[in-house]
Amino acid sequence: SRGLGDVYKRQIKNHDVRTEGVSYGMMVAVQLNKKEVFDRIWRWSKKYLQHQEGPREAYFAWSFNPVTMKQNSPGSASDGELYFVTDLLFASNRWGNETGINYYGEARRILDAMWKKDGTGNIFHIINVEHKQISFVPEGNGYTWTDPSYHMPAFMEIWAEYAKDGHEQFYRDCADTARVFLHRACNQETVLNFDYAKFHGTPHST
């Protein structure tokens, strides 16, 4: 790890740091009650991955080079933001918000920023608000299709219960939509899904 004694999770195959790795690591940490690990990963992610201004404000760069200490791409992968918000809501409920990090405040910052993203700078909400499904990426054409592995109906239920941002019913609708979508997107015999899919569940080619 580099920077303020914080840590990151490195992607071994591609030799980079990705939001899916750090946000998944935070989920494991909060589930195992490893507050110090959680806090260190979050602080690192906030410093090096999170955009602090502009159209991408509060979103995260999905890939980071730990050698050059620069972002490989400023763009976001929607599952990273999905996990970060859920991680922080879990942490808020487990440890409170008076122990050094206001977890709830950090979660709300991301959520509130999502709802302000209307396509300015080609950046959108991570959830396609028309289809009530998570997008592949909240940018450009990537907003118009999805990755089945990103669909986490239980996470949407958590947002509806604990985010308290006024969008509770929308999140519950997203949870219901995700459950229906996964039945469509997964092969009935193998229960496997394609890497990418259209919102009605058929494969999307890239």
Where are these regions (language model features)?
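Short, small-residue-biased leader/transition segments that mark boundaries at the very start
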Residues: 3-8
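Generic recognition of long tandem-repeat/solenoid scaffolds
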Residues: 9-10, 134
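Second-shell loop/turn segments in exported
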Residues: 11-15, 26-31, 71-74, 96-99, ...
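Extended ligand-binding clefts on enzyme/binding-domain cores
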Residues: 15-19, 54-57, 75-79, 101-206
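Well-ordered alpha-helical scaffold segments within catalytic/enzyme domains
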Residues: 21-37, 44-47, 82-98, 151-167
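Helix-terminus loop motifs that line ligand-binding clefts
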Residues: 35-76
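Active-site-adjacent structural elements in enzyme catalytic domains
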Residues: 40-47, 72, 89-90, 105-115
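Short acidic, glycine/Ser/Thr-rich loop/turn "cap" segments at secondary-structure junctions
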Residues: 67-74, 88-97, 135-140
